[in-house]
Regions:
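Alpha-helical membrane-embedded segments
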Residues: 102-123
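Nucleotide and nucleotide-moiety/phosphate-recognizing core
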Residues: 1-36, 56-60, 76
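Hydrophobic alpha-helical transmembrane segments
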Residues: 19-24, 48, 61-66, 86, ...
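Hydrophobic, aromatic-rich alpha-helical transmembrane segments
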Residues: 15-16, 44, 57, 61, ...
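Interhelical loop and helix-boundary elements at the membrane-water interface
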Residues: 1-3, 30-48, 76-90, 122-143
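Interfacial segments of multi-pass membrane proteins
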Residues: 8, 45-80, 91-102
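Alpha-helical transmembrane segments of multi-pass membrane proteins
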Residues: 25-30, 68-75, 116-123
Length: 143
């Protein structure tokens, strides 16, 4: 996800609405790979990190995403992983709304955030349906 977005920043302004497609393409490609007939997917979380790393020097979106992943993996541990991922991306999207209003001020980056987050959540929908209530655990780690 990093390389296409980083290269595209030399040709398309990240504040251009066309840039949304550039950012969404690697995530969709990893979620629904052509090679596997659009059925088996994976690594769209990694691709989403790469996509937002490609926005160098604007690293705030990927830093916020990394913060939420670390928070729900180390401080407030949520298991199973699919639930942790969904909660992480929801928190990331909400935080990015406020970051866009007060700091970033780029609607295309916000829309990319929401679309990428929705794609990741949608891909984890099946795993969420298979989770039984007794499997869900929230553990708060103290320093």
């Amino acid at each position: 996800g990093f390389l296409p977005v980083y290269i595209a920043t030399f040709f398309v302004n990240p504040d251009d609405y066309l840039f949304i497609l550039v950012m969404l393409a690697p995530v969709v490609g990893h979620a629904y790979p052509l090679y596997y007939g659009f059925k088996k997917g994976g690594k769209c979380i990694a691709a989403s990190f790469g996509v937002f790393l490609g926005l160098i020097p604007n690293l705030l979106p990927v830093l916020i995403l990394a913060f939420w992943f670390i928070f729900f993996s180390v401080v407030l541990i949520i298991n199973p992983h699919a639930l942790r991922t969904v909660v992480t991306y929801i928190c990331w999207m909400v935080t990015m709304i406020f970051a866009t209003i007060f700091i970033i001020k780029s609607i295309p980056i916000l829309l990319s955030t929401i679309l990428v987050g929705a794609m990741v959540i949608f891909r984890h929908n099946k795993a969420l349906k298979e989770i039984e209530e007794k499997e869900i655990k929230f553990v708060f780690k103290r320093g």
